[in-house]
Amino acid sequence: MPTVSDSANIADIHYIYQSRPNKERADKVVKRKLGRLGYQLDSKNSDKDVLTATRGNNVHINYSGTNVKNPRDLLSDVALGVGLQQKNPQFTSRKRKTRSIMREYGDDKEYSLSGHSLGGSILMNTLKESKSIRDRTNKAMTFNAG
């Protein structure tokens, strides 16, 4: 299982996808930085919204935070502020993606989830709204959720 420090570092590394529009180049940088933490990047299940990394029996899923240059993220922050997260496509798409990742890896893995800023709020909502994800999550951490 990741330490709090590992989870915070993974959340920070995830922002590389926001600053580098070329996914292949971003994957190379993310892979190198995750490797320093002992994690392997699951490139197929990683993008600007969700980063998936593995270490041993652990599958770590991180939800990215607000990208202030992305109107979709800013609208999500507003929706969150007025209590409309259930109607927000970012919330539902990340739940769907998390379920898909968990199905792909199976029941014999330990799952940890993290999220920073908007990603932390989406994570809390995902755990609240999805019993199947909540029941399979061994550890969840948020950083500056809101």
What are these regions (language model features)?
Residues 1-7:
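N-terminal trafficking/processing presequences and adjacent post-cleavage segments
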Residues 123-131:
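Short glycine-enriched nucleophile-adjacent loop
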